[in-house]
């Protein structure tokens, strides 16, 4: 365990950031699942609204550097392709 005051503070901060980032990643997984399930169910309206929500969540995560910007773009692109293929 760290002995310096600054190292202890950095450790506390990293724990907080880790919890926050995990919450964001969980949110990403859930919204992506919503889109995928709507596509499988062939529900066009639900898929479109879920895609909008997923795009927003992925872009926010990329902006906050929780996931890489290109990773977010790739996931949005693949989800959009799946929804467009359905329509």
From Swiss-Prot:
Origin: domain of life: Bacteria
Assigned keywords, A-Z: Ribonucleoprotein, Ribosomal protein, RNA-binding, rRNA-binding
UniProt xrefs under Pfam families: Ribosomal_S20p
Segments forming a coiled coil: none
An annotated GO cellular component: cytosol
A biological process from GO: translation
Disordered as annotated region, ranges: 1-22
Stretches that traverse the bilayer: none
Gene Ontology MF annotations: small ribosomal subunit rRNA binding; structural constituent of ribosome
Bias-annotated ranges (Basic residues): 1-19
NCBIfam families: S20
Annotated family: Belongs to the bacterial ribosomal protein bS20 family.
Job description of the protein: Binds directly to 16S ribosomal RNA.
Annotated protein name in UniProt: Small ribosomal subunit protein bS20
